Design a protein with these regions (language model features):
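Non-catalytic membrane-proximal stalk/linker segments that position and tether the catalytic domains
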Residues: 1-28, 129-142, 219-234
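Hydrophobic, Leu/Ile/Phe/Ala-enriched alpha-helical segments that form helix-helix packing faces
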Residues: 50-61, 103-118, 136, 209-212
Length: 234
């Protein structure tokens, strides 16, 4: 019989129709799966995109395995292990700045996997502008196509089964070029918003931005891009 059991569910109704999904955890015997389901016909393409991205990049071994289980549902393996975010917090708790910095360097490597990166003058194309608004940067910068912009430290988990770091969420991947630093900025600012107090006396947020050569001018532009992205989703 059908032994699939929903044990947790979260619905994003406040998004635009094509991005509205339910995320639920399902128990299939002993195995747990995280399922994302499109709430409307409009959302099927959004689900498909995640599956296509996984199929294209799965051989790198850095993405959490997933598969389409119906035309509007994608199921991800439920990975057990510690998130990069927690490991970073442990380093801060131990006041171990060296370890904290080495985790940031490792993160930098992870976000560069699966991506073709070029250094050039950034020229936003029409698709970019639709999502992130009109921007221009004074200097050449590294840009990548097929970037996953949701690479928060929470979304990277050290899989207990093989001790490899894996990305558990690839819902927001764009085919057009995006500055690599924008992805880093999003992760760092989200981390700081939630865990700023843990960083006290050890590192400031600006010191982290400095590690990645993110300038004050760039931060202002990235804030605007993020604002535009939220408008695009909601």
């Amino acid at each position: 019989g059908d032994i699939l059991k929903k044990i947790y569910s979260k619905i994003t109704k406040e998004r635009r129709k094509q991005f509205q999904i339910e995320t639920y955890i399902m128990k299939d015997g002993e195995q747990r799966l995280v399922v994302k389901r499109a709430l409307a016909k409009d959302g099927v393409a959004h689900i498909r995109k995640m599956s296509d991205y996984y199929e294209k990049n799965k051989d790198e071994g850095i993405l959490c395995p997933s598969k389409l289980i119906s035309e509007n549902e994608i199921a991800f393996e439920f990975l057990t292990g510690e998130s990069l975010c927690n490991t970073m917090l442990e380093a801060l708790e131990d006041k171990d700045e060296v370890r904290f910095l080495s985790l940031l360097r490792m993160y930098d490597g992870i976000i560069r996997s699966n991506v073709n990166i070029e250094r050039r003058t950034f020229m936003p194309d029409a698709q970019f502008v639709q999502v992130f608004g009109e921007v221009s940067f004074p200097d050449e910068m590294e840009c990548g196509k097929e970037m996953n912009i949701d690479m928060s430290f929470d979304n990277i988990i050290k899989d207990q089964t093989d001790s490899k770091y894996k990305i558990i969420d690839y819902e927001w991947v764009f085919s057009f070029p995006i500055p690599v630093k924008f992805v880093i900025y999003r992760a760092v600012s989200a981390f700081y918003t939630r865990n700023g107090s843990a960083m006290k006396d050890i590192m400031t947020i600006n010191e982290i931005y400095d590690c990645f050569d993110i300038t004050e001018e760039e931060i202002v532009i990235f804030e605007n891009m993020n604002e535009a992205f939220n408008q695009y989703v909601y």
